[in-house]
């Protein structure tokens, strides 16, 4: 349920008309991506893959989803989520991603430091 019962299509139209901005839809499935594009999204990202009830047993990045989206959609597809190495970023681009978002692998240094601390403090 959206605020004031607005549909995604109406929200996207408002963003386009009133703000003159492009809209990226974060999705977890091909079906959601198709719906987003039909509602007017200018691009779609694999951002929610692995983080929703329907995909919680999957681990990002969703390379299979990315490949399907690239083949079936006529808008740019962004690979976002779970990119933890340059090789993974290259694979996403090779599969046809318009762009790749690298987040925690670069900005999450604190998580990496904690993991090292935890492991190295065992049995001391």
Could you tell me what each predicted segment is?
Residues 42-49:
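Non-cysteine beta-strand/loop elements that form the S-adenosyl-L-methionine
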């Amino acid at each position: 349920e959206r605020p004031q019962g607005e549909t995604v299509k109406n929200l996207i139209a408002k963003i386009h008309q009133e703000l003159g901005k492009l809209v990226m839809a974060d999705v977890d499935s091909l079906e959601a991506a198709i719906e987003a594009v039909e509602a007017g999204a200018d691009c779609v990202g694999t951002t929610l893959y692995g983080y929703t009830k329907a995909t919680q047993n999957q681990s990002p990045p969703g390379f299979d989803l990315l490949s399907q989206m690239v083949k079936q959609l006529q808008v740019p597809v962004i690979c976002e989520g779970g990119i933890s190495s340059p090789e993974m970023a290259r694979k996403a681009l090779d599969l046809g991603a318009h762009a790749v978002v690298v987040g925690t692998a670069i900005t999450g240094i604190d998580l990496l430091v904690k993991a090292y601390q935890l492991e190295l403090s065992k049995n001391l």
